[in-house]
Amino acid sequence: MSLKTTAAALHNRNQVLESFEKALNTNDSKKREQLMTFIIVGAGATGIELAGALAEMRKFILPHDYPDLDTSTMRIILIDGGPRLLSAFSPQSSEEVKKYLTHLGVEILLNQQVKNYENNMLVLDDGNFIESANVYWVAGVKANSLAGLPAECYGPGNRLRVNEHNQIQDFKNIFAIGDTALMISEEYPKGHPQVVQPAIQQAMNLIKNLRNIESHELNKESEKYRKGPAAHPF
């Protein structure tokens, strides 16, 4: 399952609730275990937020809405091929988030690659496997290319290199915001995290800039975008 659109996100939320319903009504212990195991592949901002949301759902929603389900049987497993969570953030932020997710009961597997997933069986590159009916793939996401822009406009993840006003490199009248924008600074050497808060703030700043561009009064607030909730413990 992916999380690339609002419709997909709503569908996945319904799938989570449907898994709870099925687990509640099955007498097959193996099937129940698969339904209550949630695997997230990719420990970037999206994967971290999803893991935290599921952990909070287990803590606050399950006991209230599904009192007959044993919440201890719900597993949340976060898998990433890298050595740490949130590779785009500082090591300190990565460690803080790791500690917090561990405190919430999220199982974290680092330096692990997914080799295959079929028939509710996820196989890792070391030969180990996990049975689950719920796998969310949020790893390796990159932006689409825009026809007509030279290759040097693109950075890691195919994101467009922009200045502090969100103007694409070498262009004064083309802008990029949100996930597609790569605004490199001393504070964010790998660009801002691809989450909601920076995108909203960039959009608001761009509105002001478009209104003022003719008078050459571009705002400089874009350098101060907040990281959003993914950068801190939930």
Pin down the residues of each PLM region.
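Active-site flanking residues adjacent to catalytic metal/cofactor-binding acidic residues
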Residues: 41, 48, 79, 177-178
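FAD-site-proximal beta/loop scaffold in flavoenzymes
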Residues: 2-27, 121, 129-208, 212
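C-terminal, flexible cofactor-proximal segment of oxidoreductases
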Residues: 202-234
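Short helix-coil transition/hinge motifs at the ends and kinks of transmembrane helices
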Residues: 26-31, 64-66, 184-190, 218-223
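A Rossmann-like FAD-binding core segment of flavoenzymes
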Residues: 56-164, 170, 218-219
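Rossmann-like NAD(P)H-binding beta-loop-alpha module
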Residues: 14-71
